[in-house]
């Protein structure tokens, strides 16, 4: 199926093209009792959200989950999450941090 979408390109090239087409939003939400949660949206259904979330949680030393097609990380990690997503191959120009 992926071959049809990518015109016969190798899977690595197809994956990189998918990353470049995504527009990612990173924002902070306040939860009960003033708890802060960093929310990362726009990674799309094609991205392996659980793998990305696991990598972010490990690097940020924070808990988190994948819910409704978005990654939620406990605490305010907007800037560091952006830097880590860039290291994972997502273009910095497609990542917007909402203050």
From Swiss-Prot:
<dbReference type="InterPro" id="IPR050318">
    <property type="entry name" value="DENR/SUI1_TIF"/>
</dbReference>
<comment type="similarity">
    <text>Belongs to the SUI1 family.</text>
</comment>
<keyword id="KW-0810">Translation regulation</keyword>
<dbReference type="InterPro" id="IPR005872">
    <property type="entry name" value="SUI1_arc_bac"/>
</dbReference>
<dbReference type="InterPro" id="IPR001950">
    <property type="entry name" value="SUI1"/>
</dbReference>
<dbReference type="InterPro" id="IPR022851">
    <property type="entry name" value="SUI1_arc"/>
</dbReference>
<dbReference type="GO" id="GO:0003729">
    <property type="term" value="F:mRNA binding"/>
</dbReference>
<dbReference type="Pfam" id="PF01253">
    <property type="entry name" value="SUI1"/>
</dbReference>
<dbReference type="GO" id="GO:0001731">
    <property type="term" value="P:formation of translation preinitiation complex"/>
</dbReference>
<protein>
    <recommendedName>
        <fullName>Protein translation factor SUI1 homolog</fullName>
    </recommendedName>
</protein>
<dbReference type="GO" id="GO:0002188">
    <property type="term" value="P:translation reinitiation"/>
</dbReference>
<dbReference type="GO" id="GO:0006417">
    <property type="term" value="P:regulation of translation"/>
</dbReference>
<dbReference type="InterPro" id="IPR036877">
    <property type="entry name" value="SUI1_dom_sf"/>
</dbReference>
<keyword id="KW-0648">Protein biosynthesis</keyword>
<dbReference type="GO" id="GO:0003743">
    <property type="term" value="F:translation initiation factor activity"/>
</dbReference>
């Amino acid at each position: 199926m992926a071959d049809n979408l990518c015109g016969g390109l190798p899977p690595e090239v197809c994956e990189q093209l998918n990353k470049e087409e995504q527009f990612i939003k990173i924002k902070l939400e306040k939860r009960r009792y003033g708890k802060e949660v960093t929310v990362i949206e726009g990674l799309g259904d094609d991205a392996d959200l659980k793998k990305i979330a696991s990598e972010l949680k490990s690097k940020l030393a924070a808990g988190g989950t994948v819910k409704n097609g978005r990654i939620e990380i406990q605490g305010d990690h907007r800037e560091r999450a952006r830097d880590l997503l860039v290291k994972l191959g997502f273009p910095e120009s497609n990542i917007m941090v909402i203050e």
